[in-house]
Amino acid sequence: VKLYLVRHASASDVAPSDADRELTKEGREESRILGAALRKAGTKPEQILTSPLLRARQTADIIARELNFPDEVTACDELLNDHPLDKLLRAVKAKETILVGHMPSLAEHLAGLLGSTNPAAFSMGKASVACVELATLRLGQGELRWFLRQKQLRLLTS
């Protein structure tokens, strides 16, 4: 099983509520670059799950478009902050899944997948992605295949 943990791209700080923060122009471009880099890497997700917050949904939709993803992107409350990893893993129904969410939960999830007790070591900048491979969807059993920040993603697609 391959999981791609993605932090949403840059979003506006001005919105009626945190849930309504939209991607900025830069954030839309970051998402496009992220999707293009995943396409170049041969990523073929069978499932894309996203936090229901607008900035994450927009990030996921742009990535899906870049990957010519044929299905719907699915909103998943388990990708909101403060939801346990075991519940998120129950939502994963495919061998290759993109998960779009938020800090600090993404770092906590990444640490949990890899069997680390130090989530601070996995701090993810906006529009970054980590690929974890697991034989089975079990905590602490993952192997980090790669972790790319936006600057590296830009180099891959230029």
Predicted features along the sequence, with ranges:
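Active-site-proximal alpha-helix that buttresses catalytic centers in soluble enzyme cores
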Residues: 2-83, 91-94, 107, 116, ...
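Residue-level signal for well-ordered alpha-helical positions
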Residues: 62-63, 112-113, 135
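Acidic/His metal-coordination segments adjacent to aromatic residues that form catalytic metal sites
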Residues: 88
